[in-house]
Amino acid sequence: MKKFKKSKIFYIRFTLFILYLVVATALVFTSVVQSPVVVDIKSTSTVTATPTAIITPTPTLLPPPKIERVLIISYDGMRTDAIEKAPMPNLIKLMQNGAYSLTSAETIAYPSTLPSHASMLSGLCMQDTGIYYDRYFKYLGYSKGVDIFDLAHSAGLRTVMIVGKDKLRQLAEPETTDVFEVRYDEEAISKVAVEEIQKGFGLMFVHFPSPDKVGHKYGWMGYSYLKMLTNGDNALEEILKALDDDGLRKTTLIIVTADHGGHDKNHIGTVIQDFRIPWIISGPRIVPGELTIPIETMDTAATTAYALDLPLQDNWEGIPVYEAFGEPRLKVHKAYIQHPCHE
């Protein structure tokens, strides 16, 4: 009987031990199995929450339009401080959209209409153009050296000159100008310019004479002088409108400048206001902003040639205004010490 009881107790204990092992094993197995399931659920949840990546195509940057033509406009005797005072809103807008200098550009040592324009269009100093005079001496011929009209015409570009003074005929030979017209006020000059724009051109020079004429008669910076500049600004508006209407504006480089300034009733070169000139450039490839580097009137010719891919001449004193195109300065005027053509 005692032996049976011991066996029964042993059997109960053994059974409980087996149950314990089964339960413990089940618990361990459950935790092992469930752990990766939890991880998998979290991983799946994370992937589902991530938005699908959208590939955005990179925009293609188009190059700026090619410069197909250059228009140079010269206001005879325009001072830099008269532009805002006149006022000249169309020129100011052109300036704001382009590169400009109102403080660092100068003309030659003899700040007069004919010799100054000769240097402007030839890239040469007065002693090299041979234009020492400011009157129309037909028998003396034309400005010497290779000028931008020589280069443009040789390249097959249609060349146009519309001026307000007869003596400017001596700036370029007749065989290099397809069109040469003289008119004596800004409205008439702009009318011819609009007609020539409609015909097409490669290089055009427009000269407005009235500021100089009125300055000599009534004085620089007076009411009549400023009125002539306002009239000239209205003429500029008509020219710009013609370029827009014909779809030429985006491929036209425009340079606006002057041959000299003036004070009182003259511009004999005794004060800086006689020498200082505005220099404004607007159009394709131009980086807007103020230019503070020294600029000479001869640089107008060099910049024009550079823009039209015409060969720069070794004997030119003029240098392209590279900064206006956002390009590094390849050459500088010795003029940080002394201006060329002022010797």
Features from the language model and the residues they span:
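Metal-dependent active-site segment of extracytoplasmic phospho-/sulfohydrolases and closely related
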Residues: 71-72, 90, 228-271, 304
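Polar, surface-exposed loop/tail segments
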Residues: 310-342
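Substrate-binding rim/cap in mid-to-C-terminal beta-strand-loop elements of soluble/periplasmic
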Residues: 121, 270-311, 322
